[in-house]
Amino acid sequence: MAGSIEANITQFAVGQGGFLVGRIWRTAQNAQREFTYAFDCGSINREHFETGLDACALSRLDVLFISHLDLDHVNGIDALASKMQIDRVVLPCLDTLQSIVLACEGSDDAGVRGSIASLLRDPVAWFGERGVKSVYFVGRDSSGEGPDMRNTLGANPPDSPRPRSNGRSHKSREGEEERLPYSIRGERESAVQQIKTSRGIVEYMTFEGDVQVSVEPDVGALVSDPFVWALIPYVHPFSKITLDVFARAASNVLKKQVPIGTGLVTKRFTKQLLATLCNESSRKALKACYAILSSDNNLPSLSLYSGPVKPLHPTRIWHNVRSGQGPQFWRHRLPLGEIEGCAWLSTGDANLSSLQTRAPWLKRYEQFLPAVAVFILPHHGSNRHIHDDVLSRMPSSIKVACAATERAKHPHPSLLRRLDLLGQSFVQVSEEQPSEFSLQVKLSG
């Protein structure tokens, strides 16, 4: 059917971490075509992740989105890659800032741990050795204001064609007619480059500004088709003043100027960074530098909107929320008919309390927030990572915290009280399998 599309999005129970899988499909002439994606794949407890992975029946992912490279969000990638083919990975660009954060987080008394060091030295090869065919880096917002919404695909005049950039279009190849075509485009893009690994050729490129993955009935479809399903990643900025202070402090430790641009870090800089972190005093000094930006080493983080590019009237949306949880897991559960949206918005560990990150984040997603049915609270339900200004813009959405049951402050009791006062639904996805949470929607004309 040209006039309908279905989606099933599931947050699997992996404890203190995250593992979301989405299926987007269309059925026409008794044939079904689908697109599959995941958001994050890790947990502090590896057994919890593997149990959640066992519950996932997929054999192939078109795209794996990674919010950031903290272990509890990505340490399950080897287990994931051993179970299913991962075609493409989208993650925050490993610029100088990201590389320093990852190196500091992955260092111990002997320096940077082997797997992290290998990833830093050649991230494209690292993913390629796990069977990934393409690696797409999304640059951190450097404007501090959020992308210009006039360039956003969903904001074009109804009958105008999509703004064209080189991008990458992925059509169904011979023998893969069951896959839906999709494309990834950005406001600004690097040239496509390739490297050779033992598993084959891997291509990579960097996208900046407004970035969107479009799952379409036809790769050349106009944006006026309301059933184009979009996956919109966004990596929030830091304030320029704070970045400048950090760069000066880090430059003193590394004894060379630290660039704060959003492009891929050079191998030369990475080599010096790894060598510096072998020294205990330098390691402590560099970690202290990062505290200028973040006290918990969780930034920057990629968020992901998954839903239609155009607003749809509620009568054109069919919902099915599935959870094995009893009423004790819910707070102010809304009747199903009051859930007005059909989209899912994941946030990783984004700091949506700070005005410096919240304002551009809201600017990027504001036109899509009315469509959000499920909102994943940042940083496992941390009270200091979310502002009421964000929560109040999605009053009917279900708020979800991905957190293990034994964590005292995830979700934080103060956040639960705030949600109570706002009259909003809340559910926790823990390591307990009945807490797995799914949203299925069908959009029809």
Predicted regions and their residues:
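Active-site metal-binding motif and surrounding structural segment of the metallo-beta-lactamase
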Residues: N45-L91, E366-R384, P395-K399
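Hydrophobic/aromatic beta-strand patches that form the interior of the parallel beta-sheet core
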Residues: T10-F12, F65, V90, Y136, ...
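Active-site HxH/HxHxD metal-binding segment of metal-dependent hydrolases
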Residues: V74-W126, S396-V400
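C-terminal regions of proteins
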Residues: P378, S382-M394, C402-G445
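Short, aromatic/basic amphipathic alpha-helical patches
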Residues: T51-L53, A103-G111, S118-F127, P360-L362, ...
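A structural signal for short coil/turn segments at secondary-structure junctions
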Residues: M84, G131, M394-P395, G423
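Core dinuclear metal-dependent hydrolase active-site scaffold
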Residues: M1-S59, G128-V132, Y136-P370, E436, ...
